[in-house]
UniProtKB/Swiss-Prot annotation:
Family matches, as HAMAP family: UPF0229 (MF_01232)
Signal peptide (from-to): none
Residue ranges, compositional bias (Basic and acidic residues): 77-90
Family: Belongs to the UPF0229 family.
Gene source species: Serratia proteamaculans (strain 568)
Protein name: UPF0229 protein Spro_2732
One family name in Pfam for this protein: DUF444
InterPro entries: UPF0229
Ranges of compositional bias, category Gly residues: 92-101
Superkingdom assignment: Bacteria
Region (Disordered): 77-109
Amino acid sequence: MAYFIDRRLNGKNKSMVNRQRFLRRYKSQIKQSIAEAINKRSVTDVDSGESVSIPTGDINEPMFHQGRGGTRHRVHPGNDHFVQNDRVERPQGGGGGGSGQGNASQDGEGEDEFVFQISKDEYLDLLFEDLALPNLKKNQYKQLTEYKTHRAGYTANGVPANISVVRSLQNSLARRTAMTAGKRRALHELEDELTQMENTEPVQLLEEERLRKEIAELRKKIESVPFIDTFDLRYKNYERRPEPSSQAVMFCLMDVSGSMDQATKDMAKRFYILLYLFLSRTYKNVDVVYIRHHTQAKEVDEQEFFYSQETGGTIVSSALKLMNEVVEERYDPAQWNIYAAQASDGDNWADDSPLCHELLAKKLLPMVRYYSYIEITRRAHQTLWREYEDLQAKCENFAMQHIREPDDIYPVFRELFHKQTA
């Protein structure tokens, strides 16, 4: 009776290896599709999975095929419409007049895009790939955890690129030795017995013939053991290990004044949700301080920061003063890596903008590793932007970007937090 043993280790996800290889091969197309998809999501739906579409032409394997032109002879079965020697007109290519989404095509050519679903973890990994907190340094107390990829022995499952030839051959040798040990022992005994019988008198031809047949059968069984089996294959294994690093705090400052309409606030919320997901996904121990401001600034929790309806006038310096107070009370710059991200529409009381410049230049920027300012507006820049432009020219740890449309959010986010090369 034959027994089939399933040695696959993926359980229900038996195509996981092929899926991972597919994600690596078409990473650029997938990341482009994700960048387009994130702008269509609601504020509360940024971290779920996503249906990704890739043009079919990008994933087709190269192949030789017959061209559309030329003359070819074919034999088709007859029916009640055609008889022998009838000439059949060449059909037009299909696809343009189908029922799929999009505009109709006049040339009859077309093909649907390839659509597949990626999980939440795959989505977030691709979303935040190659991003990191800038200028992160190791301070005295190490609590923040970064994850880095390390070799972690070998695994019985993987992609061909990671196969370990030496370890696989070692397993093959061990398996063949174990499976044939008894047969080789019996073979040596029979060979010794045959040798003794050939050297003794009288000659026993029938007994010698029997021994030779048994020896031939044993050798055949030993040779039938495969040289390499899927059970022998071993792949280099890699895993993400937590590595202690410096502790960090991120200040999120958001303008909620009356000049910020709902669309502008939603774009600011999208940016901060991306930032929060990035921090919580990449680092294990990061403090996040939420500050909302109009004429007055207030430290709030996550729920109130994103969903409170409170509004008022605009004095940006109130948020900067509150941030400075919180730093002095709870976050010693000698022990903490301090980061800040400020979002506003740029509308500020004119006399307050120089004060913002002074607070940043003299108090905050000397303490922070990185300060990013995002102005969300379609109007011309005002005094606050011009004051901050002067800071950007003088301070390397200050960055500013302009967001006009929801499509700008993700590119701006990647520009502000791209991983810096050493």
